[in-house]
Amino acid sequence: MPKVGMQPIRRQQLIQATLTAVDQVGMGDASIALIARLAGVSNGIISHYFQDKNGLIAATMRHLMNALIQNVRERRQALTEDSPRAHLQVIIEGNFDASQVSGPAMKTWLAFWATSMHHPSLHRLQRINDHRLYSNLCCQFRRTLPLEQARSAARGLAALIDGLWLRGALSGDAFDTEQAQRIAYEYMDFQLAKSAS
């Protein structure tokens, strides 16, 4: 009989083991057996909690997405001003937070993006994540720009964030958070300056 209260602990163990496995060998070779071994549990535990590898991958991605949401939320709560610029900055900072740019997180995101093209449930998660970023950016740009300009600025900044993140992930070097933020801030400021003209 399983111990009461073990489910959240086991689930977290398996998610961390998945991040480690993908970091070490990639998504394709991150087998149920390897993930279970890294977590120190039997293979059957994965089936018990997640049904299969895709269920575990989806849970791992929800974990990364929730970390992103939480990081942005905490930064928003710490804001001392309510300007669109301040809110856009925390969205940028959250997307380049250490929880999103560590080696295991970056490799898992990359593998997830590739896998999501072939698995409807993972594709749905990807679309939710994309829409959340775009709508949060658009909401802030809309506070100072006309609707079409706000939409365009949001699409551009979302693409820039993803592009900077992707180039950083593929570089093989440590992610340069300061540089990525600086470039994103420059684009943000360029777009916000349009409201004054």
From Swiss-Prot:
GO molecular function annotation: DNA-binding transcription factor activity; transcription cis-regulatory region binding
KW ATP-binding (keyword) present: no
Organism domain of life: Bacteria
Domain HTH tetR-type: 8-68
Pathway(s): Amine and polyamine biosynthesis; betaine biosynthesis via choline pathway [regulation]
One Pfam assignment: TetR_C_6
Residues annotated to bind DNA: 31-50
GO biological-process terms attached to the record: glycine betaine biosynthetic process from choline; negative regulation of DNA-templated transcription
Stored InterPro entries: BetI_C (IPR039538), DNA-bd_HTH_TetR-type_CS (IPR023772), Homeodomain-like_sf (IPR009057), HTH-type_TetR-like_transc_reg (IPR050109), HTH_TetR (IPR001647), Tet_transcr_reg_TetR-rel_C_sf (IPR036271), Tscrpt_rep_BetI (IPR017757)
Sorted UniProt keywords: DNA-binding, Repressor, Transcription, Transcription regulation
Keyword tRNA-binding listed: no
Function: Repressor involved in the biosynthesis of the osmoprotectant glycine betaine. It represses transcription of the choline transporter BetT and the genes of BetAB involved in the synthesis of glycine betaine.
Protein name, as recorded: HTH-type transcriptional regulator BetI
Organism: Pseudomonas savastanoi pv. phaseolicola (strain 1448A / Race 6) (Pseudomonas syringae pv. phaseolicola (strain 1448A / Race 6))
